[in-house]
């Protein structure tokens, strides 16, 4: 899968750049709320009230942004341009 089609990176990068609030639910049901400071292939750094949490992606169940994030993949670009 190419970087252009990586939906999770698109969502996290847009949330980081736009400083959007996210709610991240862990597999055990615990919700974490905050803003994405940084992320890589395995982790997300989340900031809330001047505290940072390093969250491992394998522990995440769901990510819910505070507002809709428009994601574009090669398929949707082709459909729009097509």
From Swiss-Prot:
<comment type="function">
    <text>RNA chaperone that binds small regulatory RNA (sRNAs) and mRNAs to facilitate mRNA translational regulation in response to envelope stress, environmental stress and changes in metabolite concentrations. Also binds with high specificity to tRNAs.</text>
</comment>
<protein>
    <recommendedName>
        <fullName>RNA-binding protein Hfq</fullName>
    </recommendedName>
</protein>
<dbReference type="InterPro" id="IPR005001">
    <property type="entry name" value="Hfq"/>
</dbReference>
<dbReference type="GO" id="GO:0006355">
    <property type="term" value="P:regulation of DNA-templated transcription"/>
</dbReference>
<comment type="similarity">
    <text>Belongs to the Hfq family.</text>
</comment>
<dbReference type="GO" id="GO:0043487">
    <property type="term" value="P:regulation of RNA stability"/>
</dbReference>
<keyword id="KW-0694">RNA-binding</keyword>
<dbReference type="InterPro" id="IPR047575">
    <property type="entry name" value="Sm"/>
</dbReference>
<feature type="domain" description="Sm">
    <location>
        <begin position="9"/>
        <end position="69"/>
    </location>
</feature>
<dbReference type="GO" id="GO:0005829">
    <property type="term" value="C:cytosol"/>
</dbReference>
<comment type="subunit">
    <text>Homohexamer.</text>
</comment>
<dbReference type="Pfam" id="PF17209">
    <property type="entry name" value="Hfq"/>
</dbReference>
<dbReference type="GO" id="GO:0045974">
    <property type="term" value="P:regulation of translation, ncRNA-mediated"/>
</dbReference>
<keyword id="KW-0346">Stress response</keyword>
<dbReference type="GO" id="GO:0003723">
    <property type="term" value="F:RNA binding"/>
</dbReference>
<dbReference type="InterPro" id="IPR010920">
    <property type="entry name" value="LSM_dom_sf"/>
</dbReference>
């Amino acid at each position: 899968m190419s970087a252009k089609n990586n939906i999770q990176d698109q969502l996290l990068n847009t949330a980081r750049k736009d400083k959007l609030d996210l709610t991240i639910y862990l597999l055990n049901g615990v919700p974490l709320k905050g803003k994405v400071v940084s992320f890589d292939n395995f982790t997300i750094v989340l900031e809330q009230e001047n505290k940072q949490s390093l969250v491992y992606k394998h522990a995440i169940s769901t990510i819910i942004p505070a507002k809709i994030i428009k994601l574009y993949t090669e398929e949707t670009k082709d459909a729009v341009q097509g």
